[in-house]
Amino acid sequence: EAMRGCGGGCDFCDVNKRSKKDLPLERLKHEAKINLDYGFDSIWLHSDEMLLYGCDNREFVPNRDAITELWRGLKSLGPNFIGTTHMTFSGVAADPKLIHDISEINEMQKNGRWLSTNLGIETVAPSMVKKHLGVKTKPFSTDEWGSVVREGAKILNENHWFPAATIIIGWPDETPDEVQYTIDMMTDFRATNFRGLVAPLLYQDFSEKNSMHFGNLNEAQFTLFWKCWENNLRVINDIIPIILRNKTYGPAMKVFMYGIIKAGTWAIMRYLRGLCKDLFNGRTPDEIVEKYARSRSVSAPKIETKRL
């Protein structure tokens, strides 16, 4: 654990209630060395928002010096790489050079390695961002969030980071036009050959009556769910060769993983086709998705990333 707390203030998340705490490099080196001596060959830093490590300002601009010092200090112990569990797209877009620097410390361009990290998108509809995402978009404005996510995804891919992102479907106060913003983002991801997974999560509330269930999806929400899994199917097919080339796994494990991945994605798409027919009087996903194929949302303003 490298740090805890994020201060983002999202109204659906308990993590933002934690006080922020950064653990010092010497302690992290001590803990990492125990694992390396035990036989592990890499270091994974758990965090609620790694790019806030050492942050010393209220605008949430990443502290590049503190983070690169952390990466270099841990890399000096001899691991193959240092990964992290969580980042934010706003932190990535605010300092592209930081992402380049930690990738360079990991020698990711040199050895071709890709690392995954978790990031929350949740929604890119400006009105929903203002209502629910607190200050998650800092140092950018809430109106810029859609462009921040697109730019952040591009920066991560350019530096061999594989985003595992989440979105939330079925907010109680969400309209179809607001869902369209996120549908358009998924369309843009496909057009730019985005390499990353997007997990669609149904909104869950402390009150059961306000929680979303599959049987309550409207056409726009189903379209977004479908678009996410279309993206995931495309990306999974793209990364299977990477898995097969991975020397960590033996031939039997590679065959097993290939089978699980293919069978799992096939089962999910089959379930969604059946769900579509049940929800919308026998209509197919293609018929539903076609209605939302053309952009109806207002594009978020283009951003100038704050290069520090």
Protein language model regions, located:
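Canonical Radical SAM [4Fe-4S] cluster-binding loop centered on the CxxxCxxC motif
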Residues: 1-27
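Flexible glycine/acidic-rich beta-alpha junction loops that bind and position SAM and/or redox cofactors
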Residues: 8, 44-59, 122-134, 169-177, ...
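Conserved, mostly hydrophobic/aromatic
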Residues: 28, 119, 186
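Conserved SAM/AdoMet-binding glycine-rich loop
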Residues: 33-163, 169-171
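Radical SAM enzyme core and accessory elements
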Residues: 227, 231-308
